Amino acid sequence: MSRLGLFGYGSLVLHESASMTLGRPAGELRPVRLHDWRRRFSQRRDNLTCEKTFECAEGWRPEWILGLNVEQGEDEAGPVNGVVIELTEAELDRLDVREVRYDRVDVTGSVRGEDLPQRIVTYTAKPFHFAPEPPEDAVILRTYAEAVETGFEALGPGELEHFRATTPYPVERVEAALVIDKIPSGNPRAW
């Protein structure tokens, strides 16, 4: 039986986040590189109408929340760093529920690392949710940015620095609380 892996490049790099969605300990998260792609905050979520709405302390609800995305085309700063998480087809179905604004794509030939699964997939923003330029009133949730950076720091020396060097923050990071929760089981509620 061939092994299946997920290339995680954002919040799934955080062990706790991956484990929550998989419904089991995620196991070893092995650092790898995704070549011929770049990472950006280019996935947008309509904060006012989606399954989770966040509100800032002042009562302001930003219209758009940005999340990380990978796009084809490598940056001068180098390939996208991330992790490979081994999983089953059933677990991949759970990830599809979590990654509702993303399409699953095969990146097997673009991932470099040791002892890789025979098939590796990742998620890239669906056309409707892809924002090459941040919409007006877009923000990044501070809890999301901190979770991602915590995950990369835990991977070991140089991983957080590489993330920061290859991933610009295009808009403000804000503190916000979840005020509307229609989130499917296994999905993070902090972002």
PLM-predicted stretches and their roles:
Residues 1-191:
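A glycine-rich, hydrophobic/aromatic-adjacent loop/helix-cap motif
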